[in-house]
Amino acid sequence: MHRPTIALFACVATLTPLSCGSDAPSAGGSSGGEAGRTIDVVASFYPLQYVVERVGGAHVSVENLTPSGAEPHELELTARDTAALSDADLVVYLRGFAPSVDDGVDDVADDHSVDVADAADLSLTYTPIEEGEQNTDEANTRDPHFWLDPTRLEAVATAVADRLGTIDPADAAEFTANAAALAADLQQLDGEYRTGLATCANTVIVTSHNAFGYLAQRYGMTQMGITGLTPEDEPSPGDLAAVTDFVNAHHVTTIYYETLVSPAIADTVAAETGAKTEVLDPIEGLSDTSQGADYFAVMRANLANLRVGQDCT
């Protein structure tokens, strides 16, 4: 049973180049190099889908393995999903985020896949500590939620552009230009966050799970998740009591919940402490309840909610 704790993070230098399969196309995929053709890409979950669509533009057709409204951490592949991985020209995924996707890539897509982990620089490790004792269940696990720091998506966009360019060299310059345009938009979003969160009465955020470590690090905040790196853990009554004590001790007035999982746990903590609840979306996927139609819209909705919840001026 996971015990909720303050998430402490250690920065680990990432020195290896982008981890991915060889540039050779899959047996089931297209041969590549044909100007004007559509590149079939499979992305494992929404932020990667968004990057591929922005970078590839009209030259790509992107399938998201995670259905709309589904939580991608525990995604289980169907036979159709496995066939899609095999037949794609390119699979873009994040190793360690969804184990079934890792297994599927290893089985049928190793030679036409790109793992974005190294480009994203997963430099935060999640180390839960409670009363001086380390919880070994998740100790030293890399935090995968890099896209909540918009600056980390820039390198991923460049990596995707490079890989698409090897498949379609005739349009490589366009992919590079699209990645640069996305990077400019991400830099603008980063500036909005830095300005919007520069002066807040409370810099401690309490979230339903520990998805916001990169955001917290980038913008000078401290995160505490009620559950660990995945939202499926069920906290015990003792766990909830520890969270309640933390909320009271740090004068937290807002408990943040997500759109893809039940808000029941956040509601329980809020009821015990007198705090209110508000959405803070980890953008692992979109649904009908998402506060925006794409990555940038949801990130800006998150910023607005943080400014209110943290009493920023």
What residue spans do the PLM features occupy?
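Sec-dependent bacterial lipoprotein signal peptides
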Residues: M1-L18
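Extracytoplasmic metal-acquisition and chelation regions
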Residues: H2-P4, C20-T313
